[in-house]
Amino acid sequence: MATYDLIERLNSTFRQIELELVTLTERLKGCRLLAARVFTLPDVAKGAEHDELNTIEVEQHIGQEAVALTLAHYRHLFIHQQSEKRSSKAAVRLPGVICLQCDGALREEIESQIAHINTLKMAFEKIITEESGLPPAARFEWVHRQLPGLITLNAYRSLTVLRQPATLRFGWANKHIIKNFTRDDVLSLLEKSLKSPRTVTPWSREQWIERLEEEYDNIAALPAETRLKIKRPVKVQPIARVWYAGQQKQVQYACPTPMIALFDAEQGAMVPDIGELLNYDADNIQHRYKPQAQPLRLIIPRLHLYVAE
């Protein structure tokens, strides 16, 4: 059960995040704009949060318009800040970058403040997901009782700051969450579900128990040494590949929110090479390298659970 002290820390941590974001955006406004390019994605409609996306059309924004969208995006934490038709369960994504020039002292202040904001965001997420002791289904109600209308994923999302990047290229990443299990691991999970069964639409409680028992029997019939995998697809994500000329290295970043690239005023107006984010089309994905997939046999579809052949 969440204590009064925990609720106080939840609220005070969130207020700190809000305050720090206000002061950060003011600091960023004081920098010289070198370049900015961000890409708006279509809204996720209510009820469509888990729909598979085969195409995503992006719209490009540059210059001061991109900066304005970026600064508003950092502080977009509540559903009243968006269309009523847009889902409050899906975080708003705005890939891109703003490139700013400032003196060394201001750069250090900005980097330090962003690190502090990210620490607060991690603490806020930990309060909700770990310290509350609540199961996932109960967290939503608890958080929204304290902070009505909060878009939790937006509040969790960290900020990315870059120093002196030479080039930035944007793209899309298709990933899977893969976890390995033994037969006994899965049997243990199913046993827990059977001990505290719930009603899952469209089945009655009794029908759901029958399904769980059938799944349990199917797993129990496998040899003890069977290797099992959960291979669950993750919604396609925007990414950025950043090249640092001074270090001669490329780094790939998740890019759900605009990155902040800082450039020292002492080194002159070095404008980086910024690429576009093209529309996503699942039918035209080109893989640089696609290793041969391990043969898998689906055994429990709802869990994305496979037998490794």
From Swiss-Prot:
GO terms for biological process: DNA replication termination. InterPro entries: DNA_replication_term_site-bd, Tus_dom1, Tus_sf. One of its GO terms (molecular function) is DNA binding. Keywords: Cytoplasm, DNA replication, DNA-binding. Belongs to the Tus family. The gene is tus. It holds the Pfam family Ter. Trans-acting protein required for termination of DNA replication. Binds to DNA replication terminator sequences (terA to terF) to prevent the passage of replication forks. The termination efficiency will be affected by the affinity of this protein for the terminator sequence. NCBIfam families: rep_term_tus. Its main location: cytoplasm. GO terms for cellular component: cytoplasm. It is found in: Cytoplasm. Gene3D superfamilies: 3.30.54.10, Replication terminator Tus, domain 1 superfamily/Replication terminator Tus. The keyword Cell membrane does not apply. This is DNA replication terminus site-binding protein. It comes from the Bacteria.
